[in-house]
């Protein structure tokens, strides 16, 4: 029979890893918001059109909303994990006490069986009830462990979804930057052509 306290220590390590993953997601979102702000400032300095500025501003607002929603959801999942871990810890301690009581009772039963054969059946029945109760407690602990694993899987899926979203957003930003460079080069080329024509007209006059 596995020792619940040993299991609890391993479970805590897994949960700590899950919490680190949550923090990574939040930090990534905050970094994205910071980058969007920098993009807005840079575009403002380069005389970006009002439509482009409003589009970037809207994206920033949307990212802030998504960040807040994700942060709230992760906080809720973290609360569930903490609650589940608290229950596991309480049940583990209770199970340990009951196991000690069971071992003590079993030792007492063995001594009394030798001394009081008439009470043997009654004492054995009591021990069986205690053992059955311990088995039920272990089943509850296993259920809590499965619940924690499911919560960790949800967190992992949310993190992967966020990474995919960030990848799509970066690709979009690269495309927008490329288009802006093309338009800027085209604008400079058009301006140079107009100046050349203007000088030629002045010479002809």
Curated annotation (Swiss-Prot):
GO annotation (BP), single: cell differentiation
Source species of the chain: Rattus norvegicus
This protein's UniProt keywords: Coiled coil, Cytoplasm, Developmental protein, Differentiation, DNA-binding, Nucleus, Spermatogenesis, Transcription, Transcription regulation
Basic residues bias (residue ranges): 186-205
Annotated region described as Required for interaction with CBX5 and TBPL1, given as residue ranges: 138-185
Quaternary organization: Homodimer. Interacts with CBX3, CBX5, GMNN, GTF2B, TBPL1 and the polycomb proteins PHCF2, RNF2 and SCMH1 but not with CBX1 or PCGF2.
Protein name, entry field: Spermatogenesis-associated protein 24
Any Pfam family the entry gives: SPATA24
A molecular function (GO) term: DNA binding
Tissue expr: Highly expressed in the testis and is mainly localized in the spermatids. Also expressed in the lung, heart, spleen and epididymis.
């Amino acid at each position: 029979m596995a020792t619940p306290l040993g299991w609890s220590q391993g479970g805590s390590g897994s949960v700590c890893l899950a919490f680190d993953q949550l923090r990574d997601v939040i930090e990534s979102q905050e970094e994205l918001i910071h980058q969007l702000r920098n993009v807005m400032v840079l575009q403002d300095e380069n005389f970006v059109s009002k439509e482009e500025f409003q589009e970037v501003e809207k994206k920033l607002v949307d990212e802030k909303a998504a960040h807040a929603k994700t942060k709230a959801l992760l906080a809720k999942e973290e609360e569930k994990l903490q609650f589940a871990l608290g229950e596991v810890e309480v049940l583990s301690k209770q199970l340990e006490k009951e196991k000690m009581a069971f071992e003590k009772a079993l030792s007492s039963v063995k001594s009394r069986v030798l001394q009081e054969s008439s009470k043997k059946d009654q004492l054995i029945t009591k021990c069986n009830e205690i053992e059955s109760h311990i088995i039920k407690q272990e089943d509850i602990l296993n259920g809590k462990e499965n619940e924690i694993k499911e919560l960790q899987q949800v967190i992992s899926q949310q993190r992967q979804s966020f990474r995919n979203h960030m990848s799509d957003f970066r690709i979009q930003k690269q495309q927008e930057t490329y288009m802006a460079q093309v338009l800027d080069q085209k604008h400079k080329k058009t301006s140079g052509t107009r100046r050349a024509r203007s000088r030629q007209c002045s010479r002809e006059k």
